């Protein structure tokens, strides 16, 4: 069975950033497939290309309309602009995730076909009329009979001084997760752990920025207090049943990579200890071996959510996020969802996210065109 791995693992990049595989010692494969290739930065792409042997086929899968890497370069988008590579470029025009009539599909298509010449207010009006169910998000809990929905609520300026009501709205998506944790705690021996994992993975809060009232840190703090109150537990050295965490760097000793997400449970053999299960790796790690500053992950930044998929995403940002908002950011956020998108946003900031595009110039296109002639 093929086991997926990060590019860092594939190339053998360790602490010294000296890859095990390179031009003089290439990868021992006939085919290498890279998913979510829009996230490739220039440096990592260079290391990858150098390690590909002459008889190996490299396949890059990705959506150039999504966010590029946080580091230098937009490699996938640049490669698509090189005339010499036009016959190597194939574009999927029929979505296999959701059909063209689905609300999320309409939302994604709406962003893809935005015209720069259309007045901004007309764009927003068209979105409100054609795509969104413009209503108060009285409950954003995932229901089985709500399999195709885009919800929209604009933040009320008069309520922003005390946003607790908004936080509680966002927490409703985690009610099934709380219920699954309660059941697990009461019947751990007979409950399938996969059901708890799935209850968590069904829903995620996505934010644009780290700081501020609707930033990553504040929402995760509120979610932590909310969950521990619901479960009536007291954290021990920061750990508690159900705490979701995400690695923010590669730890080669633990075998964990940047972006790996795990959930905290009571230790299977030592009831006074905690351990964290990482589903994507099918791996348990003692909580006390993980870094003390590991990130709680009820909410993720949109950048960090790339490559993930959830039944329901709640996207939240206020005016303080305006500087980084773009079509690519909002497009990436909505395409993380399979069924439901709930937007809880500042109106002016949302308008900016629909009308502003990110422009990057790494010089890669120019260089590739020069060497292809």
Language model segments and positions:
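C-terminal accessory regions
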Residues: 260-373
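Walker B catalytic acidic pair
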Residues: 35-36, 62
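Conserved helicase motor core of P-loop NTPases
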Residues: 65, 69-245, 251-253
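Inter-Walker segment of RecA-like/P-loop motor cores
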Residues: 1-28, 300
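Catalytic acidic motif of RecA-like/P-loop NTPases
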Residues: 8, 38-39, 46, 65-66
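Short glycine-/polar-rich loops that comprise or flank the Walker A/P-loop
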Residues: 29, 54-57, 85-90, 201, ...
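Residue-level recognition of short, solvent-exposed, well-ordered loop/turn junctions
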Residues: 53, 238-241, 257, 305, ...
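Short basic/glycine-enriched coil/helix segment immediately N-terminal to the Walker B
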Residues: 16-30, 40-56, 200
């Amino acid at each position: 069975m093929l086991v997926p791995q990060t590019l860092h693992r594939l190339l053998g990049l360790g602490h010294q950033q000296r890859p095990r595989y390179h031009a003089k010692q290439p990868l021992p494969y006939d085919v290498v497939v890279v998913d979510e290739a829009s996230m490739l930065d220039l440096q990592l792409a260079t290391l990858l290309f150098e390690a590909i042997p002459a008889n190996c086929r490299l396949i890059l899968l990705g959506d150039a309309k999504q966010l590029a890497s946080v580091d230098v370069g937009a490699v996938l988008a640049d490669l698509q602009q090189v005339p010499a590579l036009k016959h190597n470029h194939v574009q999927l025009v029929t979505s296999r995730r959701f059909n063209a009539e689905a609300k999320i599909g309409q939302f994604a298509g709406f962003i893809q076909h935005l015209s720069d010449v259309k007045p901004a207010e007309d764009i927003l009006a068209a979105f409100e009329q054609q795509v969104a169910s413009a209503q108060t998000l009285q409950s954003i809990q995932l229901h089985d009979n709500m399999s195709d929905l885009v919800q929209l609520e604009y933040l009320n300026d008069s309520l922003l001084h005390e946003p607790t009501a908004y936080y509680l709205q966002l927490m409703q998506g985690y009610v099934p997760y709380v219920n699954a944790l309660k059941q697990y705690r009461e019947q751990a021996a007979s409950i399938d752990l996969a059901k708890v994992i799935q209850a968590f993975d069904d829903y995620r809060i996505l934010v644009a920025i780290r700081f501020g009232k609707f930033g990553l840190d504040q929402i995760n703090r509120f979610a932590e207090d909310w969950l521990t109150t619901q479960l009536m537990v007291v954290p021990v050295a920061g750990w508690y049943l159900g705490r979701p965490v995400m690695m923010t760097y590669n730890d080669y000793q633990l075998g964990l990579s940047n972006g790996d997400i795990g959930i905290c449970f009571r230790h299977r053999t030592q009831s006074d200890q905690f351990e964290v299960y990482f589903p994507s790796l099918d791996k348990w790690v003692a909580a006390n071996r993980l870094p003390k500053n590991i990130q709680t992950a009820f909410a993720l930044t949109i950048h960090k959510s790339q490559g993930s998929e959830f039944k329901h995403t709640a996207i939240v940002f206020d005016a303080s996020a305006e500087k980084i908002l773009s079509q690519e950011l909002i497009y990436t956020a909505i395409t993380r969802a399979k069924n439901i998108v709930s937007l809880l946003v500042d109106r002016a900031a949302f308008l900016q996210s629909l009308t502003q595009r990110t422009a990057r110039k790494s010089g890669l296109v120019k260089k590739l065109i020069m060497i292809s002639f």
